[in-house]
């Protein structure tokens, strides 16, 4: 263990170990300035580009020539075609993003407030759930029910006569009479 409260001013002198079992090692040692930076070199050599050029001319330290093998799928293709393909890919990506957003909107799990129940993508009060359960059926059945009601209504309702129907029918009769008179004459 280390005994706290050592005096740093006595850095050169070592205190003997005390009998109480504590070491007298200081927790922090003073910083020596000579450790911070190295002495500057006596001579600095800076090589310029002209000193490197002779090595290159002599053939020393040249990397070996490696044949390049590249395959380009865009070689021989016009810039207009490249831009067109890029635009098509961008439009396809944006279309996918739009379809994903639309799908998430329609399939979004909606949470209803307290006292309401989600029924056919609508929040309805719990008290009216039994009423909606009686009407609940598939879309095809609803379609046929509507058509049957329409046919029954069409058959059961007598044809209503508009006040204009009598005027129109009289005009047709008068036209037919004039045509018949013209043919006979």
UniProtKB/Swiss-Prot annotation:
It is a single-pass type II membrane protein. Its main location: membrane. GO terms for biological process: amyloid precursor protein metabolic process; apoptotic process; clathrin coat assembly; endosomal transport; neurotransmitter receptor cycle; neurotransmitter receptor transport, endosome to postsynaptic membrane; positive regulation of receptor recycling; postsynaptic neurotransmitter receptor cycle. It holds the Pfam family Calcyon. Residues 1-82 are cytoplasmic. It is found in: Membrane; Golgi apparatus, trans-Golgi network membrane; Endosome membrane; Cell projection, Dendrite. GO terms for molecular function: clathrin light chain binding; ionotropic glutamate receptor binding. Induction: Up-regulated by TP53 after DNA damage. Up-regulated by genotoxic stress. GO terms for cellular component: cytoplasm; dendrite; early endosome membrane; endoplasmic reticulum; endoplasmic reticulum membrane; endosome; glutamatergic synapse; Golgi cisterna membrane. Residues 104-185 are lumenal. InterPro entries: NSG (IPR009431). It comes from the Eukaryota. Forms a complex with GRIP1, GRIA2 and STX12 through direct interaction with GRIP1; controls the intracellular fate of AMPAR and the endosomal sorting of the GRIA2 subunit toward recycling and membrane targeting. Interacts with STX12. Interacts with APP; could regulate APP processing. Interacts with FAM171A1. This is Neuronal vesicle trafficking-associated protein 1. It comes from Homo sapiens.
């Amino acid at each position: 263990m280390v005994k706290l409260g050592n005096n740093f001013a006595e850095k050169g002198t070592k205190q003997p170990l005390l009998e109480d079992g504590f070491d007298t090692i200081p927790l922090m040692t003073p910083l020596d300035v000579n450790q911070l930076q190295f002495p500057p070199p006596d001579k600095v050599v800076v090589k310029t580009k002209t000193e490197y050029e002779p090595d290159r001319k002599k053939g020393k330290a040249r990397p070996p020539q490696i044949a390049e093998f590249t395959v380009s799928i865009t070689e021989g293709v016009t810039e207009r075609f490249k831009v067109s393909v890029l635009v098509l890919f961008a439009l396809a990506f944006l279309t996918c993003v739009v379809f994903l957003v639309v799908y998430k909107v329609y399939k979004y799990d909606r949470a209803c407030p307290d006292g309401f129940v989600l029924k056919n993508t609508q929040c309805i009060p719990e008290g009216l759930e039994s009423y909606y359960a009686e009407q609940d059926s598939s879309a095809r059945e609803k379609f046929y029910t509507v058509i049957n009601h329409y046919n029954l209504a069409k058959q059961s309702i007598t044809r209503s006569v508009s006040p204009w129907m009598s005027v129109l029918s009289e005009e047709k009769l008068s036209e037919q009479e004039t045509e018949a008179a013209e043919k006979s004459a």
